[in-house]
């Protein structure tokens, strides 16, 4: 049988760590994977990974499926369109329904993660009727629950990771800059500060880079792979970001600043001066807090067998085997499709005339 071809679609740097476990499973099965990376996203491929640099190359590659951890996927790419999500449904803002559950008409398959997402998407599947939902677990979870990732850090001094979200009105970075600088100077802790690629405020970035430059115990990390940071840290300071949950997968505590949905799994504070005492409590790993963390993470991601990527590929096989039986037609989405073509400069008819 001829090897299957799969396309991995990247719009932002966080996609690499989500898609690489899937790529490993594809290769393990004897099939092939290639990457298409949007023009404004940094290329961070590893040796041996295949990079399709043009839209024409991606279309001609003719994959059986395309995987996207973002909100959209080019409809003109061949193959089954698979949504993998860029995180978990944690509700960053105060809202009735998280935008995690927004259906935009791009995807054929939604690969859900667990009880926090599957029931909602099953209801949307019934409501819309043009896609199928499979609970597979998140491919990135294969990395989190591997034995090597679960190893506890051995730091001489406690390490605090600070990865604030970019979301307006939720981001803690403007409010905590002075307090973090004070704690860096007065507490026996090491700090790692890293920002989401969408957090682009130049004053905020410059302020935290200055703190790192002036304090030997502070690192400002810039790069797409946050996993080594999560592994190294003993505790996290954050606000309302899905990276909180990912850190908790490693059985580690989190202090949040004005979290939009606080609960017993978090140590949430509402004033900057409370951050230091909260971090001290987190570093002591109270038994009740750690028990709540384990229950919370299981609600979001019960799949701990490192086979989420395998289930994603099995879902694609099942979708193809069943065909479109019982499915409605996708919406035309003409305006969205036109905007996407304009954004990606995809005009195949013009290409034909130019030949």
What annotation goes with each model-predicted range?
Residues 53-60, 201-248:
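Donor nucleotide-activated moiety binding/catalytic core segment of transferases
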Residues 15-27, 139-209, 304, 308-310:
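Conserved catalytic-core segment of nucleotide-activated headgroup transferases in glycan assembly
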Residues 283-355:
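C-terminal amphipathic helix plus adjacent low-complexity
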Residues 45-56, 78-86, 210-219, 252, ...:
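Active-site regions of enzymes building and remodeling cell-envelope glycoconjugates
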Residues 104, 129-130, 210, 242-304:
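Catalytic binding pocket for nucleotide-activated donors in carbohydrate/polymer assembly enzymes
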Residues 71-72, 77-85, 223-266:
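A donor-sugar binding/catalytic signature common to diverse glycosyltransferases
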Residues 32-42, 46, 187-222:
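Catalytic donor nucleotide-activated moiety binding site of glycosyltransferases and closely related
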Residues 7-147:
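Active-site and donor-binding regions of nucleotide-sugar-utilizing enzymes
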């Amino acid at each position: 049988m001829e090897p299957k071809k799969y396309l991995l679609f990247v719009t932002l740097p966080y996609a690499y760590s989500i898609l690489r476990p899937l790529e490993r499973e594809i290769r393990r099965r004897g099939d092939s994977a290639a990457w298409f990376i949007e023009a404004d996203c940094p290329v961070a491929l590893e040796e041996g990974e295949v990079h399709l640099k043009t839209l024409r190359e991606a279309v001609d590659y003719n994959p059986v499926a395309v995987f996207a951890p973002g909100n959209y996927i080019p409809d003109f790419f061949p193959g089954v369109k698979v949504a993998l999500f860029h995180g978990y449904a944690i509700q960053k803002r105060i809202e009735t329904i998280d935008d995690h559950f927004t259906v935009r008409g791009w995807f054929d398959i939604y690969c859900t993660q667990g009880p926090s997402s599957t029931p909602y998407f099953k209801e949307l599947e019934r409501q819309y009727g043009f896609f199928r939902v499979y609970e597979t677990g998140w491919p990135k979870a294969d990395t989190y629950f591997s034995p090597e990732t679960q190893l506890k850090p051995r730091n001489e001094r406690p390490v605090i990771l600070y990865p604030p979200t970019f979301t307006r009105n939720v981001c803690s970075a403007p409010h905590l800059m002075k307090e973090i600088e004070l704690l860096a100077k007065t507490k026996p802790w090491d700090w790692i500060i890293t920002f989401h690629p969408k957090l682009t405020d130049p004053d905020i970035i410059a302020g935290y880079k200055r703190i790192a430059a002036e304090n030997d115990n502070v690192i400002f990390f810039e790069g797409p792979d946050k996993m080594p940071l999560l592994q190294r840290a003993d505790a996290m300071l954050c606000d309302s970001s899905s990276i909180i949950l990912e850190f908790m997968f490693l059985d580690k505590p989190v202090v949040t600043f004005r979290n939009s949905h606080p609960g017993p799994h978090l140590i949430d504070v509402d004033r900057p001066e409370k951050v230091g005492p909260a971090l001290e409590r987190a570093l002591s790993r109270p038994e009740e807090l750690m028990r709540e963390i384990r229950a919370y993470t299981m609600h979001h991601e019960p799949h701990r067998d490192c086979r989420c990527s395998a289930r994603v590929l099995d879902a694609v096989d099942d979708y193809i085997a069943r065909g479109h039986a019982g499915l409605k037609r996708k919406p035309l989405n003409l305006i969205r499709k036109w905007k996407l073509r304009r954004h990606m400069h995809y005009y195949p008819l013009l290409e034909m005339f130019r030949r």
